[in-house]
Design a protein with these regions (language model features):
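Cap/insert and terminal regions of metallo-dependent hydrolase folds
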Residues: 2-22, 103, 108-112, 133-203
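Flexible, acidic/histidine-containing loops and adjacent segments that form or flank the divalent-metal
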Residues: 2-136
Length: 203
């Protein structure tokens, strides 16, 4: 078994989560400490591996059973934290800085640090990108738009999971135009999901 995390083992972007107790955003300190204890227990007692999400890799998530029979299957890691794969090797480009993320009174949101990946099998291609956002308005700086620079790296897909539970601050027009999915999956958990604006963009 393997556990993959966006910021293992340092957990220091945008702040040191091991010592962060200010409640300025992200995961609750008590919950994070419990996660660390869980991971240590699993490593020690059950041999579980813990790895950092390897941006650009198409080897980290691989078939376990008879992979040679499915040469067209691939999972490609596209984005994690503030780093986006360039499409070449393991090269990445930063989408925003720690300072930009913490600009509002030192508070931050984990959403923009979400991982993103693409699953391919033959002609089928599927995108999933967690809570990555794509909105720019009077309340959100340009860096908040993760989707527009990520779109050409992902390219056209067969199907996709709508970013941020299909919330109105994600799945922007640029992203939809480039990915051009035939099927979308909305992982809704609130009465305002999907956002009406997202619904209009999907029409």
């Amino acid at each position: 078994k393997t556990y993959v995390d966006r910021d293992y083992p340092n957990y220091n972007f945008p702040v040191d989560l091991r010592t962060n107790v200010s409640g300025n955003g992200g995961v609750e300190p008590a919950t994070f400490q419990n996660l660390l204890k869980f991971l240590e227990f699993q490593k020690t007692n059950n041999g579980m591996k813990v790895e950092k999400f390897d941006i650009g890799s198409n080897k980290q998530f691989a078939l376990k059973k008879d992979p040679k029979s499915y040469p067209g299957f691939e999972i490609r890691n596209i984005k994690s934290n503030n780093l986006l794969w360039t499409g070449k090797g393991k090269n990445t480009t930063p989408l925003f800085t720690k300072e930009e993320l913490l600009a509002k009174n030192g508070k931050f949101n984990d959403n923009q640090m979400s991982t993103a990946l693409v699953v391919k099998y033959g002609k089928f291609k599927y995108y999933a990108g967690g809570d990555n956002s794509g909105l720019v308005d009077q309340d959100h700086a340009e860096w908040y738009d993760i989707e527009t620079p990520m779109a050409p790296i992902v390219g056209k897909v067969s199907a996709m999971s709508l970013n941020h539970h299909s919330n109105r601050d994600a799945t922007n027009r640029n992203f939809l135009d480039v990915l051009d999915p035939k099927v979308v999956v909305a992982q809704s958990w609130s009465t305002d999901h999907p956002g009406s604006e997202v619904g209009q963009r999907l029409l």
